[in-house]
UniProtKB/Swiss-Prot annotation:
<dbReference type="GO" id="GO:0005777">
    <property type="term" value="C:peroxisome"/>
</dbReference>
<dbReference type="GO" id="GO:0006801">
    <property type="term" value="P:superoxide metabolic process"/>
</dbReference>
<dbReference type="GO" id="GO:0005634">
    <property type="term" value="C:nucleus"/>
</dbReference>
<keyword id="KW-0479">Metal-binding</keyword>
<dbReference type="GO" id="GO:0008270">
    <property type="term" value="F:zinc ion binding"/>
</dbReference>
<dbReference type="GO" id="GO:0001541">
    <property type="term" value="P:ovarian follicle development"/>
</dbReference>
<dbReference type="GO" id="GO:0005739">
    <property type="term" value="C:mitochondrion"/>
</dbReference>
<dbReference type="GO" id="GO:0019226">
    <property type="term" value="P:transmission of nerve impulse"/>
</dbReference>
<dbReference type="GO" id="GO:0005737">
    <property type="term" value="C:cytoplasm"/>
</dbReference>
<feature type="binding site">
    <location>
        <position position="63"/>
    </location>
    <ligand>
        <name>Zn(2+)</name>
    </ligand>
</feature>
<dbReference type="GO" id="GO:0072593">
    <property type="term" value="P:reactive oxygen species metabolic process"/>
</dbReference>
<dbReference type="GO" id="GO:0006879">
    <property type="term" value="P:intracellular iron ion homeostasis"/>
</dbReference>
<dbReference type="GO" id="GO:0060087">
    <property type="term" value="P:relaxation of vascular associated smooth muscle"/>
</dbReference>
<feature type="modified residue" description="N-acetylalanine">
    <location>
        <position position="2"/>
    </location>
</feature>
<keyword id="KW-0007">Acetylation</keyword>
<dbReference type="GO" id="GO:0042542">
    <property type="term" value="P:response to hydrogen peroxide"/>
</dbReference>
<dbReference type="GO" id="GO:0032991">
    <property type="term" value="C:protein-containing complex"/>
</dbReference>
Length: 153
């Protein structure tokens, strides 16, 4: 069973980063890392369905959602498995990621291994935007950078 994973984020522009995933205890996955080249502010941060980046980040498909739920925030009961909320970049364009999540997993039905991590252009409205797109994507906009999540030591 995997206890650690890593993802290298790259895109067509300057946004890049490395994200680490580590199982802590039985269910909690600690997500850490750094993303550079972002505009200042919040950016949607999600695990997408497929580990396919052949057409850039768009071929990664929708948010990872094995339970067919509506989009939500990371603390919501009603959320996609892949909904990790937002990362926040400072004036220097760097976002330091620190998320503890008990919905994603590194094995089993909620495993994110082999799926794509995506950082988006806009803030995720956490499903509270009042329109249909909000319940699917959080109105987070285009995909700035992505990478496939793989097992590591």
């Amino acid at each position: 069973m995997a206890t650690k994973a890593v993802c290298v984020l790259k895109g067509d522009g300057p946004v890049q980063g490395t994200i680490y995933f580590e199982l802590k205890g039985e269910k909690t996955v600690l997500v850490t890392g750094t993303i550079k080249g972002l505009a200042e502010g919040d950016h949607g941060f999600h695990v997408h369905q497929f580990g396919d980046n052949t057409q850039g980040c768009t071929s990664a498909g929708p948010h990872f959602n094995p339970e067919s739920k509506k989009h939500g925030g990371p603390k919501d009961q009603e959320r996609h498995v892949g909904d990790l909320g937002n990362v926040t970049a400072g004036k220097d364009g760097v976002a330091t990621v620190y998320i503890e999540d008990s919905v994603i997993a590194l094995s089993g039905d909620h495993s994110i291994i082999g799926r794509t991590m995506v950082v988006h252009e806009k803030p995720d409205d956490l499903g509270r935007g009042g329109n249909e797109e909000s319940t699917k994507t959080g109105n987070a906009g285009s995909r700035l950078a992505c990478g496939v999540i793989g097992i590591t030591q």
